[in-house]
């Protein structure tokens, strides 16, 4: 949620930002109009309350009963006006609040302006794409042949976009999760969390998933519970409605969770394999920091995610996302791993800085110094990394001519020393 003062003091800045992300700049005028009506109503209520207070004192001083009754009746009318105006102010406040919840964040000046994902900018490519002397297979062929991916049974029990992982495939995923979390905790200084997979609507509002993305989230019927689309939601809401001490910052958390997304997928797009699913696992990094340090913390976050890519020795690239692909971030970078069997780059991490946009919605603040007025923290999050796309990259980059898959060296201690699948 944006600070209302931006609309009052820098409306042109907000209009420009909305235009860049494809939202109607006219929304700024709606906000300003509602804010003005609300403030006028509040001012009038305060004036009437002062009038009522003065009138009440006057009534107390009036000894003539008839005159006192007239003044009491007049004060009752004032009270009725106050009640009516209070209701109007509350209705306007709710309308304004709901409008602000639906508005996007503002992109930083350095974010490239674009119309869609094709306008994202490749910052750099790391690693060398290998060209083996045999026909590279896609992961779905490898996985089925190795007996570690079962698509038929997954679809039979749950429908399209579901699969069953078996045997060493599961062990590979567990190894990845443990290795990634150990890296983030031991090397990068994160605190590991185990969080609920179901959260209330308020938590979804806090991270910006509601109301805008309601149709992409699974809701438990007849309850106020929603399945999390990412650990970002429960982890960010850990400090909802709290005032932190400056000494507690920065807070760096990491969590592994399943993620559930009711994405509307185009028929025929990415039908095969495990690239696009309604349920998948992910390791997520979340930070809550002082505003002055948030930009530096973003590149530290990206570096933390890159360390996973480097450890696996899989070619990857870093992209800066354009204004059309930011979501609710103010600046965002993606990491994509090369998948030779699919002949494409796969997003495995999206690292974003949100400024105080989420903190304002979730009311997460900190006190810069003892006795000082609380201020909103800045939040950041990024995948560290997303599964099962990392598994796709491992299967397709580490496959051998005989159909087996070499286990990346860093994962072998987590797999009991197993060096090869198949």
Curated annotation (Swiss-Prot):
It is an enzyme of class 6 (ligase). GO terms for cellular component: cytoplasm. The keyword 4Fe-4S does not apply. The keyword Translocase does not apply. GO terms for molecular function: ATP binding; serine-tRNA ligase activity. Pathway: Aminoacyl-tRNA biosynthesis; selenocysteinyl-tRNA(Sec) biosynthesis; L-seryl-tRNA(Sec) from L-serine and tRNA(Sec): step 1/1. Its EC number is 6.1.1.11. Its main location: cytoplasm. SUPFAM superfamilies: Class II aaRS and biotin synthetases, tRNA-binding arm. ATP binds at residues 261-263, 347-350. One of its GO terms (biological process) is seryl-tRNA aminoacylation. PROSITE patterns: AA_TRNA_LIGASE_II. It is found in: Cytoplasm. Keywords: Aminoacyl-tRNA synthetase, ATP-binding, Cytoplasm, Ligase, Nucleotide-binding, Protein biosynthesis. It catalyses: tRNA(Ser) + L-serine + ATP = L-seryl-tRNA(Ser) + AMP + diphosphate + H(+); tRNA(Sec) + L-serine + ATP = L-seryl-tRNA(Sec) + AMP + diphosphate + H(+). Coiled coil: none annotated. L-serine binds at residues 230-232, 284, 383. Catalyzes the attachment of serine to tRNA(Ser). Is also able to aminoacylate tRNA(Sec) with serine, to form the misacylated tRNA L-seryl-tRNA(Sec), which will be further converted into selenocysteinyl-tRNA(Sec). NCBIfam families: serS. Homodimer. The tRNA molecule binds across the dimer. Belongs to the class-II aminoacyl-tRNA synthetase family. Type-1 seryl-tRNA synthetase subfamily. Consists of two distinct domains, a catalytic core and a N-terminal extension that is involved in tRNA binding. This is Serine--tRNA ligase. It comes from Herpetosiphon aurantiacus (strain ATCC 23779 / DSM 785 / 114-95).
């Amino acid at each position: 949620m944006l600070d209302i003062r931006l609309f009052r003091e820098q409306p042109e800045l907000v209009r420009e930002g909305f235009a860049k992300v494809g939202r109607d700049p006219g929304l700024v005028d709606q906000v300003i109009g509602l804010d003005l009506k609300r403030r006028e109503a509040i001012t009038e209520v305060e004036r009437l309350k002062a009038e009522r207070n003065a009138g009440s004192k006057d009534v107390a001083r009036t000894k003539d009963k008839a005159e006192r009754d007239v003044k009491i009746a007049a004060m009752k009318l004032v009270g009725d006006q106050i009640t009516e105006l209070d209701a109007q102010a509350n209705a306007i406040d709710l309308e304004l609040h709901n409008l602000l919840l639906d508005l996007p964040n503002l992109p930083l000046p350095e974010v490239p302006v674009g119309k869609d994902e094709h306008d994202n900018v490749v910052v750099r490519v790391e690693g060398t794409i290998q060209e083996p002397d045999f026909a590279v297979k896609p992961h779905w062929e490898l996985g089925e042949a190795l007996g570690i991916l079962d698509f038929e049974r997954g679809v039979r029990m749950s429908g399209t976009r579901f699969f069953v992982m078996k045997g060493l495939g599961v062990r590979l995923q567990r190894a990845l999760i443990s290795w990634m979390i150990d890296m983030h905790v031991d090397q990068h200084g994160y605190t590991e969390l185990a969080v609920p997979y179901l959260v209330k609507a308020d938590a979804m509002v806090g991270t910006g998933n509601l109301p805008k993305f309601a149709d992409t989230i699974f809701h438990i019927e007849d309850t106020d519970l929603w399945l999390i689309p990412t650990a970002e939601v429960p982890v960010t809401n850990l400090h909802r409605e709290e005032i932190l001490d400056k000494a507690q910052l920065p807070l760096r958390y990491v969590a592994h969770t399943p993620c559930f997304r009711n994405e509307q997928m185009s028929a025929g797009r990415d039908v095969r394999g495990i690239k696009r699913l309604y349920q998948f696992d992910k390791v997520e990094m979340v930070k809550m920091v002082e505003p002055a340090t948030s930009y530096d913390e973003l590149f530290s976050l990206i570096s933390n995610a890159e360390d996973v890519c480097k450890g696996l020795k899989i070619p990857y690239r870093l992209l800066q996302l354009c204004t059309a692909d930011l979501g609710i971030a103010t600046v965002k970078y993606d990491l994509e791993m090369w998948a030779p069997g699919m002949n494409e780059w796969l997003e495995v991490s999206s690292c974003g800085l949100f400024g105080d946009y989420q903190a304002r919605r979730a009311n997460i603040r900190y006190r810069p110094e003892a006795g000082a007025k609380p201020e909103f923290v800045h939040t950041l999050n990024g995948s560290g990394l997303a599964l099962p796309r990392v598994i796709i990259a491992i299967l397709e980059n580490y496959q051998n001519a005989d159909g087996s898959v070499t286990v990346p060296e860093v994962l072998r201690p987590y797999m009991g020393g197993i060096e090869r699948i198949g």
